Amino acid sequence: MRTAALLFVAPAVHAFVAPSANAPLARLAPLHVAPITVTTLDDAVTAKVISAELQEMLDREWIEQDCHVVIGQNAADAYLGARAKGLDDVGSILQHVGEQMTTDFPVDAYVGPWDCANFVSDTLVALASGERCECSSAPTAEELEARAAEFGSETS
């Protein structure tokens, strides 16, 4: 019985290798990624873009609902609140917007507050860096720049 157990366990033991002191430096050192900041964006214009784009995305993805206007405005207000508190990196703003939107979110919406906060962060990343995740429902950076121009200012 013990021999049979060893036949099954012995190969699995070799799968667990102790860390090597000779491992490449890339594996030993933590990866530092600089946060994306929104300091170059015009906050008033960015808030308008967030409100309009979020409302349009919700109308497009689901059905047109009056609560989408409220959600868009609440997201814009939460963004402005984050900026007023001095938050300038997208991660901190995402956290702030999500927390603010959970306090008073329309019950008739088909999405949740964190879905909307994630859309806001995707929009901010596209505006601030020009980058966009392919899985994002946020418009491209070029589309967002055109929308910002409609509101009277360039964002970057």
Descriptions of predicted regions:
Residues F16-S156:
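N-terminal plastid-targeting presequences
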